[in-house]
Amino acid sequence: MEFGLSWIFLAAILKGVQCEVQLVESGGGLVKPGGSLRLSCAASGFTFSNAWMSWVRQAPGKGLEWVGRIKSKTDGGTTDYAAPVKGRFTISRDDSKNTLYLQMNSLKTEDTAVYYCTT
């Protein structure tokens, strides 16, 4: 009986500390080479304004590739980019909307991928 109660107690503790982080991307589509796209990532379940946020991507049949990141405003809000996208992609954030953006210009066929935001 004690064993069963211990498990119930443990489950109650775990349930109490659950935190559901949600990152929902939108804005993808089909564009011709040279075109532009803007992706959005709506965040919830954590303090977005304090978080450093990144974009990664996965091309068909390939592994994950880091695209870039933006620091929190308190840490300067600066951005860094992977060499293949530098000068073409821009990451920004709107802390009032808990939203991260990826503006992609001068798109190339090699930019074809599934894009994910991460923290």
Curated annotation (Swiss-Prot):
Region (Complementarity-determining-2): 70-79
Keyword Disulfide bond carried by entry: yes
SUPFAM superfamilies, per the entry: Immunoglobulin (SSF48726)
Keyword Disulfide bond applies: yes
Signal peptide from the UniProt entry: 1-19
Region Framework-1: start-end pairs: 20-44
GO CC terms: extracellular region; immunoglobulin complex; plasma membrane
Region (Complementarity-determining-3) location: 118-119
Gene3D superfamilies linked: Immunoglobulins
Domain Ig-like: 20-119
Residues covered by region (Framework-3): 80-117
Main location: secreted
Ranges where the record places region Complementarity-determining-1: 45-52
One biological process term in Gene Ontology: immunoglobulin mediated immune response
Compartments, as annotated in UniProt: Secreted; Cell membrane
A GO molecular-function descriptor: antigen binding
Keywords: Adaptive immunity, Cell membrane, Disulfide bond, Immunity, Immunoglobulin, Immunoglobulin domain, Membrane, Secreted, Signal
CDD domains assigned: IgV_H
Chain spans, region Framework-2: 53-69
S-S pairs: 41-117
Subunit structure: Immunoglobulins are composed of two identical heavy chains and two identical light chains; disulfide-linked.
Biological role stated in the UniProt entry: V region of the variable domain of immunoglobulin heavy chains that participates in the antigen recognition. Immunoglobulins, also known as antibodies, are membrane-bound or secreted glycoproteins produced by B lymphocytes. In the recognition phase of humoral immunity, the membrane-bound immunoglobulins serve as receptors which, upon binding of a specific antigen, trigger the clonal expansion and differentiation of B lymphocytes into immunoglobulins-secreting plasma cells.
Name under which the protein is recorded: Immunoglobulin heavy variable 3-15
Provenance organism: Homo sapiens
Gene (name only): IGHV3-15
